């Protein structure tokens, strides 16, 4: 309907109609700049030794699932792979049909009335790359590159990347900033839990249910409902303050650090791809690294990429 309307306004001039749609797209982009583009289409493709993922984002799943929208995403990805583009800025300038990719997106925005934007462009280059579109739903795509040719292993690891969303290939690939942040979180959580344990023990000794006084809101509500007497409420506040402060002041730094280090090790195991528990094996539990070694003693992951529009 919008295309027909543009043609009518352009008196049958296709070039003028396209320009009208492009102008509408620009107006929509400006007007709806604060809108969320949480839906869209994510595609992945490999041609010879070059593979890429790209996402074209929009506002609704109705538009995202439309054949024209998916085709536009596919056309842009084809152009990117043909040009072996390495950045999203490069992709936006590539010819798609009779316009550049960004103009084609803007024109489609003018047709649908929704804000649209390109995102998530990433590439892998070289041999032994496997690509995966999760359930062929075009919302989550992955790519994995191995150091040896093993399509089955590559495909399974690509599924692993989709399912378990690793943050890094291995521990050495985790940024120092992430390690520092995770260790700080682990230390804070350990201190909090040890203090809470001491406070709860003191509350129970005083005959007070810790669940009834875990927040000031609960203390007030449970006092009104008769679960606590005013005296118990005041005693609970006093215990939480004094015991909490005393315990926090006497925590053993070495013990705290050891527990936090254990938590950091758990973070690496759960979030580093090679250390994750392999989800697609046939027998005993094994890590991804162990699975690869069972296929070929020198088989390793060179690199991986993952992009999704789904909330996780």
What spans do the regions from the language model cover?
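N-terminal assembly/interaction segments in proteins that build large macromolecular machines
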Residues: 1-312
């Amino acid at each position: 309907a919008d295309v027909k309307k543009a043609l009518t306004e352009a008196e049958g001039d296709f070039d003028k109609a396209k320009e009208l749609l492009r102008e509408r797209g620009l107006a929509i982009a400006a007007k709806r700049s604060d809108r969320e583009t949480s839906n869209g289409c994510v595609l992945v493709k490999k041609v010879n030794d070059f593979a890429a993922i790209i996402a074209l984002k929009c506002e609704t799943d109705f538009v995202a699932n439309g054949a024209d929208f998916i085709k536009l995403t596919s056309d842009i990805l084809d152009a990117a792979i043909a040009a072996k583009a390495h950045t999203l800025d490069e992709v936006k300038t590539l010819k798609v049909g009779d316009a550049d990719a960004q103009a084609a997106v803007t024109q489609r925005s003018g047709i649908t009335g929704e804000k649209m934007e390109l995102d998530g462009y990433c590439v892998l280059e070289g041999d032994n790359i496997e690509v995966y579109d999760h359930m062929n739903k075009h919302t989550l795509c992955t790519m994995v590159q191995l150091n040896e040719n093993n399509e089955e292993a590559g495909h399974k690891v690509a599924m692993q990347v989709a399912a378990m969303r690793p943050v890094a290939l291995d521990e050495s690939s985790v940024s120092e900033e992430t390690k520092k942040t995770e260790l700080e979180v682990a230390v804070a959580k350990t201190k909090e839990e040890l203090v809470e344990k001491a406070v709860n023990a003191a509350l129970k000794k005083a005959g007070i249910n810790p669940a009834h006084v875990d927040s000031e809101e609960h203390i007030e509500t449970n006092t009104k409902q008769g679960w606590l007497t005013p005296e118990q409420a005041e005693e609970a506040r006093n215990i939480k303050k004094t015991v909490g402060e005393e315990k926090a002041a006497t925590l053993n730094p070495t013990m705290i650090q050891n527990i936090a280090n254990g938590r950091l090790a758990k973070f690496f195991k759960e979030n580093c791809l090679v250390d994750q528990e392999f989800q697609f094996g046939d027998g005993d539990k094994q890590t991804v690294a162990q699975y690869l070694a069972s296929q070929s003693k020198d088989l390793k992951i060179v690199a991986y990429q993952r992009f999704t529009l789904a909330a996780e």
